[in-house]
A protein has these predicted regions:
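Glycine-rich active-site/cofactor-binding loop and its immediate structural neighborhood
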Residues: 27-58, 69, 76
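Core beta-strand elements of the Rossmann-like FAD/NAD(P) dinucleotide-binding domain
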Residues: 37-46, 164-173, 210-211
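Redox-cofactor binding/interface segments in oxidoreductases and associated redox assembly factors
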Residues: 1, 49-50, 86, 176-177, ...
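Glycine-rich dinucleotide-binding loop and its adjacent helix/turn
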Residues: 51-106, 110, 135-138, 190-192, ...
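Cytosolic Rossmann-like ligand/nucleotide-binding regulatory domains
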Residues: 275-281
Length: 281
């Protein structure tokens, strides 16, 4: 709440008009905002889409906020987990697994790939897994959750191991960290013909979409989905719109980080990606 109020104050201080409601593009340069009081049409030569993304649910067990959580629920938990299942071992999954393990929960991580933090170098994955297991965490790679049932007492999961064996285990809570879904529904992309790739808005190096005057930044665009990338895209788009000295972002130079113990950070190609690109490593 304090953070929200701080941002609201900054918007007011800088004389930025804020319209609360649901926005929908109706034409290039035109936006309709629907609120309880009615609809307001806004026009501008440049419009930036920054609607972000939301956590992807398991198709057979959507998050309920009580026993099955997304990262949003895990940030402000209604109760401290005693035995926690984390599905997915990307940055979000590992960060929460590490945090709750440090807080005393018994943590199990299930990852369908053959190693955790799969976007990192293989050596990093191996080192991190060894460290987390040493801290008491259970990590299952090459595994998947076949079913997930939640009730007032906890969560029951059927987990398929690497060798194909399915076992059932009970947990107090579950965090689902299997990716994100862009918030692009109902904002008028189809009407304007704005191009998307797997649901995410396609942009060039200056954050421009294929429709002149329409820009997009942050998690609603292509990966990596990182806060520092999103904020820098805001700078890029603003500079380009202002006509100053715009600069394109090279996605190969975006650092990634995972806030766990031990911490993980990387930039550039992994050894495997470098070899795939034909480099002599």
């Amino acid at each position: 709440k304090q953070l929200n109020q701080g941002v609201t104050h900054l918007m007011k201080k800088n004389k930025i008009a804020v319209h609360m409601g649901d926005g929908r593009l109706t034409a290039p340069g035109t936006l309709v905002v629907k609120a309880d009081a009615g609809e307001t049409e806004l026009t501008a030569p440049n419009i930036i889409i920054a609607t972000g993304a939301r956590a992807r649910d398991l198709p057979f067990a959507p998050a309920d906020g009580q026993r099955i959580w997304t990262y949003r629920h895990a940030m402000v938990p209604p109760a401290m987990p005693t035995k926690l299942l984390v599905i997915g071992s990307g940055a979000i999954g590992i960060e929460f697994a590490s945090f709750y393990n440090d807080m005393g929960a018994e943590v199990t991580v299930v990852e369908m790939m053959d190693r955790i933090v799969p976007v990192e170098d293989g050596d990093v994955s191996a080192f991190l897994e060894k460290a987390l297991v040493k801290q008491g965490m259970t990590i299952l790679t090459g595994a998947g959750v076949e079913s997930l049932q939640a009730d007032a007492g906890g969560v029951t999961a059927a987990i398929k191991d690497r060798d194909g064996t399915v076992r059932t285990d009970s947990f107090s809570h579950c965090i689902v960290a299997i990716g994100i879904v862009p918030n692009t529904e109902g904002i008028g992309l189809e009407a304007l013909g704005i191009q998307t790739v797997r649901g995410h808005i396609q942009t060039d190096g200056l954050c421009r979409t294929n429709v002149p005057g329409i820009w997009a930044i942050g998690d609603v665009t292509a990966p990596p989905w990182l806060a520092h990338k999103a904020s820098h895209e805001g700078v890029i788009a603003a500079e380009a719109i202002a006509g100053g000295h715009p600069h394109a972002m090279d996605p190969r130079n975006i650092p990634g980080c995972t806030y766990c113990h031990p911490q993980v950070a990387s930039v550039g190609l992994t050894e495997g990606k470098a070899r795939e690109a034909g480099h002599d490593v």
